Amino acid sequence: MNTNDEKMKIISEDFTGDGVDTEAGRRKKNSKVRRQQRKKKPPASPPEEMVSDKFQDGGQQEVVEEEPETNLLSLTARRGPRSLPPIPSASRTGFAEFSMRERMREKLQAARSKAESALLRDVPTPRPRRLRSPSREKETETEFGTEPSTEVQDTQKEDDTKSYSRIKFRDSVRKIKSKPQLPPGFPSAEEAYNFFTFNFDPEPEESEEKSPVKGGERAHHEDQEGEEGTQAQERAKKTEEEELLNGKDAEDFLLGLDPTAHDFVAVRAAEYKSARIQLQKEKEILFTPSRLTVPTYKKLPENIQPRFLEDEGLYIGARPEVARTNENIMENRLLIQEPGSKWFGDDGRILALPSPIKPFPSRPSLTTREQSPKAGLETLYKKAEKYVHSRQHMIGSGDPPGNFQLDIDISGLIFTHHPCFSREHVLASKLAQLYDQYLARQQRNKTKFLTDKLQALRKAVQTSLNPEKPHQSLDTTQKTINEYKSEIRQTRKLRDAEQEKDRTLLKTIIKVWKEMKSLREFQRFTNTPLKLVLRKEKVDPKLDEDAYEAEIQAEIHELLEEHMEEYATKMEEYRTSHQQWKAWRKAQRAKKKKKKQTTEEHLEEEEAEESFPEEEVTKPIPPEPTDPAVIEQQVRERAAHSRRRPGEPTLIPELSLAGNVTPNDQCPRVEVSRREDVRRRSVYLKVVFNSKEVSRTVSRPLGADFRVHFGQIFNLQIFNWPESLMLQVYETIGHSGTTLLAEVFLPIPETTLVTGRAPIEEVEFSSNQHVTLDHEGVGSGVPFSFEADGSNQLTLMTSGKVSHSVAWAVGENGIPLIPPLSQQNIGFRSALRRADAISSIGTSGLTDMKKLAKWAAESKLDPNDPNHAPLMQLISVATSGESYVPDFFRLEQLQQEFNFVSEEELNRSKRFRLLHLRSQEVPEFRNYKQIPAYDREIMEKVFQDYEKRLRDRNVIETKDHLDMHRATVAKYLQQVREAVVNRFLTAKHHFLLTDLVVEEEVPNISSEGSGILGLSLFKLAEQKRPLRPRRKGRKKVTAQNLSDGDIKLLVNIIRAYDIPVRKPVVSKFQQPSRSSRTFSEKQTASPSTHSPLHNADYPLGQVLVRPFVEVSFQRTICHTTTAEGPNPSWNEELELPFRAPNGDYSTASLQSVKDDVYINIFDEVLYDILEDDRERGSGIHTRIERHWLGCVKIPFSTIYFQARIDGTFKIDIPPVLLGYSKERNIIMERAFDSARSLSEGSYITLFITIEPQLVPGEPMREKMSDMLKKFDTQEDEKLLQATEKFQAECALKFPQRQCLTTVTDMTGKTVFITRYLKPLNPPQELLHVYPNNPQATAELVARYVSLIPFLPDSVSFAGVCDLWSTSDQFLDLLAGDEEEHAVLLCNYFLFLGKKAWLVMGSAIPEGPTAYVLTWEKNYYLIWNPCSGHCYGQFDAFCPLKSVGCLIGPDNIWFNIQHHDSPLRINFDVTKPKLWKSFFSRSLPYPGLSSVQPEELIYQHTDKAVAAELQDRIEKILKEKIMDWRPRHLTRWNRYCTSTLRHFLPLLERSQGEDIEDDHRAELLKQLGDYRFSGFPLHMPYSEVKPLVEAVYSTGVHNIDLPNVEFALAVYIHPYPKNVLSVWIYVASLVRNR
């Protein structure tokens, strides 16, 4: 390129973007520059060179600091005066400077004129300004220099020319800079010429630092350049001119002027760089790794030996094939590049994944050229074969028919025991089995394997403990070490166990051999050729001793580490406990100190607050450190027991058949007879395929060694897959018949097992036949002994092994002849495989996945090993839930095929859900009937109650329970019930024949007599006696055919005794009002003797009573007629309907009915309300009122279980009955008094039954009870067997008497009943009431027990069982039946020092129940724990009617006397003729521990809570009474209520005795103007509903007088453990006129 072209490119680059305005500005600047430079001295150097160099330098500065499309003048003005450092000033004006300026001016003018003409020619229109993208700027401003020889031609575009010219300027400046710089001073002509080019800033660092900042400023200004106006440009130009003339970089401006083409081209020699220098520079910049092998120590941390995992037993995959040179290069590079990286493994080699290349190709091989590609598409014709069907298990229709073959190879048979075995044969067989076991263990050599594993683990621990272990965190290292140590412990235990087994086995072999030699010496002949030789291998004592001691020390060290870790853990726990104890003790001291400082006023409050005893914290005991001597002694003892002693030679037994058998002529006669018997016996086998005999072996004689060789192969031609394969072993004796010894089942072979590959296997068999022989043969199934005295007897059964192999045959073409398993969905076998893929392959393929996964986890299989891949995949699939092997057999394999709808759709069906819930006997749907046939007919609200109960399962509702404790107890009882119901679900579904089949009994002519005809025939001719009718048996009905209205409750009221009689009413004025006098009072005062209400013989003019009975059940009321006198007789039958809850008449529902039958006795009083006595002769105006006297409450569950209740019951009469007294008639009741002993009260005789008679549900099936005794109990098996035997003997003698030995606790487990009896402390405050009166204390304790609410198990656990809870559970639940009350009361009496027993018998009305019997000084007392009453033994009104057994803390006595009534039996249990004891001399008492707690802890009940509960109950009862009187106004007499409220605490303290007169006087004093009728009710508190029912049954609200007033008071007395005594006083008041 010539200079003119270069000039044109440079000029176009600098000026094209700015146009004419820029040209004018440049001219002004040139004139200013010339004036500036005249002051300087002209240089002596040639002007061409100087201009060229100067321009080149200026071009370089421009390119470096200037961006494209930027005007030179504007940039210079923007750059400011500090772009370049100042030039050192000197006096340089002269001719040279002047001439240089003139030449510069002329050349510039010429260049400018040429540029203008070129621009006008090439660019007719000015080029618009635009901003360039950063990418273009970056492409333009590259740092790669270009040599002048590599310039491109001028055909390139203008942008390329601009960038290229800048690159050239930059290279020129770079070359000039490389030259040495001259020192400053007065220049010569050459120096003056070169001044502008080479005199640079002496501080170049400052320029370099400032340049990027200016560049940033320029970029910021350039962004706003296109938006500036014309005026702003002119102002900028003026400012730039001034700065150029006066600034410091005027020289720099001249450097940027455009020179001519020949001024900046320098001609010099070409630069050359040698190859050596080039390589040297490349070595400084580039790194070339070495190809030499890197030493191993450089690739591992210091002091670390390489570890080869493959030698330690871990699987290492095959590494990919890489050239060793490449591997060395990579290792050297990694060591230099990343010296601390994780690229190297423990073996010093680069980490590499196993080679992913398969050893065989995945794609099928291409067909050869000779074979035509259409050959595989040709049709192959095969003739159709007729298929033979056989039973089931047929091949699917898609399977090809054909003949298949199964080969059975029967090698031989050997007996491990036979009836003809002599004693020596028994020992020889045992010795042979032991030796086989020894050989098997030696082949496995598990001891050595575990020893090597233990050494490897110890070595791994030592390697992991190295502190310089790389690329592992401390947590990971510690975790690995802990895993190693845990595995070391486990491996050491296994190694010790294996060593002990080996040593024990060797000792046993030697022992049996010695016994065999002793037997041979004793019998003086030999029957077997066995001979045992013990070969000794000597060992090096020194090495053996060292190894032994090293192992001992290593084990001691490991055990010490374990104990130290355990000690450290215990020590940490001790420190924590000790700190807690110190804090507790400090708090206790602070409390004591605070207690001393409090005043006496606050003592009571603090005692009330601290009434709950705090749990005392015991001082912890520090753990004892481990004694190393003890550890060492234990290790050495264990080693001496299980290992070979050091220096002791190794014994290797060798069993051979080198012995000699004694000939027959040297043996005794019995042995010769045995050998003759063996010769007469022969054995053969039958082959049974699919339960059919297909072949049999030849009969072979039994050898003297009891071995039989067959050597036969049976080829079975089959069509279907085999169901079973069996061998039958037969034995023939002489010419007699054959005997089947055993059946041996053979597994169906796998489909991969073919003939030629099947190994010979041994399968064992045994026989249960009993054989006794008359010679030396020991027989089978009969005992024999090796001892002379017949001790240590053995009983062996016939057994042996059959050697066989079963495999599939191979056809002529090499294809196995196996019945195919069709892959289609048709065919039984295919469906079987699809339903259960694993179990369908046959019994040999069954695998327990749980055990397999457990074994894999414990064995720690290497998951990287390809050999384990199928196993690991199978385990992962099985454990993930996708597939599993069930631990049960499938009853319906094809259920999935017959499912007509999916599970999801079935679960969405409302009808199916309803049916499912009903079948599960959910309470809301238990007896749901008439379920609609379509889902659309079932409403969503049907499930609302059930879903609400599920949501509120854990929510405790206090609506039905006024206090929180009882609400919690009710919730807990519900949870216990659900748990127990689930546990006894099996018993409920264990049906008997009578449950399913209801039919009348076939008349039996001898059913009621002991003879052949019996008494049935005599009854036909028996005379009828109408005055003495006999009860006939009723038919029992079940719940299936019952509905509402079918069941009636029949109550027969017969008579009553000692009803309270009225007392004369006396007011303040000693005269009642006219209207308040009863008929009886007036009749008594009148002279007439004809009134039926008054008898002349009635002594002392007593007031009569007119009682009648009202029966209330489920709010249905019936009553009898009114009788007269204190001993009335009704003999009336009342009928009440029964309605089951929710219409459910099932057994479980009937058992859970909580309703009670209330039998109330009322006195009917007639009041004369006639106002005028003068009208008495013409009319009668009376009003009938009834006064409640007492009641008898009988639960319906008792009636249901007893079927009928017949007896005399004590009437519960309130302790205060105003207007009535118990003054008995002296004349009429004298005979009655003679029969009374300790009991006082009124009685009523009843007969209650249900019509029709219902079948009561059995609480638990006998079989289920037996099963629970066997599986759910912690009692000793011998004790349970003794209980079963004891109960069987007792039931055989007296089947109707109750005999109880074991019971079921709250968890469903069987417990021996005496464990429930133990002295337990009653509440302390009860013992302080009567400290000197034991009898009063006993009555008070009995009353406390009776205050705990009664809840029978038949209601709480309906249809399940009778559960017994311990006393602490009973007090926590505050609910229980007779057994819990009796156990608690008996335990209290035992604590008080009384002789007490639990009485299991039958009472009225409870039925089978539990009472308590105590022995006082000279008589027995029978206590009813539910009522708190006690009765004498000879009390005729005692509710206990029969006694079955007595239970004490240490024994059980069953009543074997002829009578069972308490009146007629003797309670002296020391007489064995009267009482059969469970524990006796033959079975002594084993000292059973009690299930009861050591002591009972009582919490005091909060009195404030009791008072709040009292107010709430009173409010509820008042609201109920007002609801019961909807047609009348109910007025409350507050004054009377206050009086009654003050009276109720007196009743609680005196228990209702000896305060009636004081109470009557108080009421007469305060309420004399009122006729008062009322009574207090006393009940234990459980919930509100029983209180409401009790008040309702009294009928106090049934008074219709307009001026009647009511009074109601409630008092609750709290006892410990939240036991509450409730008193309710209800009264009605009528003002006297």
UniProtKB/Swiss-Prot annotation:
One of its GO terms (cellular component) is cytoskeleton. Residues 1031-1209 form the C2 domain. Keywords: Cell projection, Cilium, Cilium biogenesis/degradation, Coiled coil, Cytoplasm, Cytoskeleton. GO terms for biological process: axoneme assembly; camera-type eye development; cilium assembly; determination of left/right symmetry; embryonic brain development; heart development; kidney development; motile cilium assembly. Residues 1-12, 99-115, 154-174, 209-223, 234-245 have a biased composition (Basic and acidic residues). It is found in: Cytoplasm; Cytoplasm, Cytoskeleton, Cilium basal body. Pfam families: CC2D2AN-C2 (PF15625), CEP76_C (PF24652), CEPT76_peptidase (PF24656), DUF5523 (PF17661). InterPro entries: C2_dom (IPR000008), C2_domain_sf (IPR035892), CC2D2AN-C2 (IPR028928), CEP76_C (IPR056288), CEPT76/DRC7_peptidase-like_dom (IPR056290), DUF5523 (IPR041510), Tectonic-like_complex_comp (IPR052434). The keyword Cytoplasm applies. Residues 1-188, 200-245, 590-673, 1068-1094 are annotated as: Disordered. SMART domains: C2. It comes from the Eukaryota. PROSITE patterns: C2 (PS50004). Residues 1068-1092 have a biased composition (Polar residues). The keyword Cytoplasm applies. Its main location: cytoplasm. Residues 602-615 have a biased composition (Acidic residues). Residues 26-42 have a biased composition (Basic residues). Residues 440-501, 554-611 form a coiled coil. Transmembrane segments: none annotated. Disruption phenotype: Embryos show randomized left-right axes, holoprosencephaly, microphthalmia and a variably expressive curved body axis. Cc2d2a null embryos also have cilia defects, which are exemplified by the absence of Arl13b staining in neural tube and surrounding mesenchyme. Component of the tectonic-like complex, a complex localized at the transition zone of primary cilia and acting as a barrier that prevents diffusion of transmembrane proteins between the cilia and plasma membranes. Required for ciliogenesis and sonic hedgehog/SHH signaling. Part of the tectonic-like complex (also named B9 complex). This is Coiled-coil and C2 domain-containing protein 2A.
